[in-house]
């Protein structure tokens, strides 16, 4: 439960949110490209896009990290909550309760399985070693708990509460961003989409495994884990508010590369705060509020994402056309 169980629950929660309601589904325009044009219009184009993203991130990362003061917004989220407790308390209590229940379950299993091994190794240091083993157990149980809490998006309602509290007048329930997908019966799915996703997720799991191994280092490991995944933390927090701003799934993904420095900056502070057990249960809510405030103060408009729009316009536009078989 403390390891594989948390990962399984986190994965299920993420999939439910990713393919859940509140979205309109359209085929990726690439599915209409004839197979004899794939070399130029699919493979070379995607490779060129990856190289362009890499260059852009490397050239703008550090400048972007301090643009807009993204690292201050986890604190601004706390101040917003402190100023308007009555508006946020009910939703925040539900999130905190879910965190505490999950943290208790993970801690129980962790203490029954992994803590004895740490104790056996560190007991040679005497009382200090015992203290390190116990304290690290809480830190790492918090890591596994947050994997589930973040990917399950328990904080989504809080995003809507914060937007409404800050004067959003449109009916949020009517906003349905597009989710582009590749039909399983299309050439594009088998010739590019599935192999690419398979490699991507295998590499992702490998990186996650390495990061989790790092988190096993006593005391410093869990903190390093949160620092290293800081852009991913921000991606999760920004997903809901960007959906409500009508960003489709391609634009949300592109946004990570266009603002990689801001994602890392916000996630760095949010991750450090969430490294503290129990406090993390409150920080999930205040960081959520902070992510909304950042997007309100520095709005990101889908139409300005030139590369994303060019990517879609470069392909045939009749997305209702039957894909080549």
From Swiss-Prot:
Loss of this gene results in the following: A combined deletion of the LDS proteins RRT8, LDS1 and LDS2 fails to incorporate dityrosine and another yet uncharacterized component in the outer spore wall.
Topological domains on the Extracellular side lie at 113-118, 230-263
| Listed GO biological process terms | ascospore wall assembly
Keyword Iron-sulfur on entry? no
UniProt keyword annotations, A-Z: Lipid droplet, Membrane, Sporulation, Transmembrane, Transmembrane helix
Recorded GO cellular component terms are:
ascospore wall; lipid droplet; prospore membrane
The places in or outside the cell where this protein is found are: Prospore membrane; Lipid droplet; Spore wall
Q: Which domain of life is it from?
A: Eukaryota
Those parts of the protein on the Cytoplasmic side are 1-91, 140-208, 285-325
- Bilayer disposition of the protein: Multi-pass membrane protein
Where are its TM segments located? Answer: 92-112, 119-139, 209-229, 264-284
Q: Which InterPro entries match?
A: Spore_wall_assembly
The main location class comes to: membrane
Q: Tell me, what does this protein do in biology?
A: Involved in spore wall assembly.
The entry assigns this protein to a family as follows: Belongs to the LDS family.
Protein's recorded name = Outer spore wall protein LDS1
Q: Which organism was this protein described from?
A: Saccharomyces cerevisiae (strain ATCC 204508 / S288c)
- State the organism's lineage: Eukaryota, Fungi, Dikarya, Ascomycota, Saccharomycotina
Q: Which gene encodes it?
A: LDS1
